[in-house]
Amino acid sequence: MRICLIGKNLTNLVLAYNLASKNLNVDIVFDKKNQIKFSQRTIGISKNNFDFLLKMHKQSKIIAWPIKNIKIYNEKNKFKELFEFKNKNIENFFLVKHSNIFNSFYKICSKNKNIKFKIIKNSTNLDSIINDKKYSIIINSETNNQLTKKYFNLKVEKNYDSIAYTGIIDHKKIKNNQATQIFTKYGPLAFLPISNSKTSVVFSIFKKFKLEDIKIFELIKKYNLIYKIKKKIS
């Protein structure tokens, strides 16, 4: 059996390795133009899913940071804690750099004889893949290619009228296992630890404010309740 996965993304890399481990042949087909770079992006993975990834491939070099509790604040309540998510002595989830986990699974898949990477010059060629009888199963996990637009054009969309700004702050070393979410008048701001001296920041700012980078940095420092920032956000 040969399976085709459309899109060179984290979802398909994990799926491809899992299928290949069952001795199935997998082709990962992708258009270079559709590749998105996530240099500073971080993702949260639940403990169960993280354990599953490690169990699936024990040699995978995934650098993850445990988050034991999440605190929620609101600017309207003068930054008083609204509530906290916490499981005693158990990590709520793990934070990992997208680039780290992506590169880890890409390296694993590249060395697997049952997995092939195939580049297509234009996403319009995807129609020929649909009609290719050598594939028993075809899975499309891209959100914006020709096939998605053609076959999945009915969808519900929600426009939040905001832009997400991401970065990483270097700060004085502390015990850093608490994630923080602050609802500000500009939009929600999250501080997501990735080490004892580095924290990922995600600030979703409503478009109506049209803030410059220097103003955004000043707001992050203003709403920062925990960290002693060493230098400008990267």
Regions found by a protein language model. Give the residues of each.
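Glycine-rich FAD pyrophosphate-binding loop
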Residues: 4-8, 17-41
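Conserved N-terminal helical subregion
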Residues: 65-152, 157-163
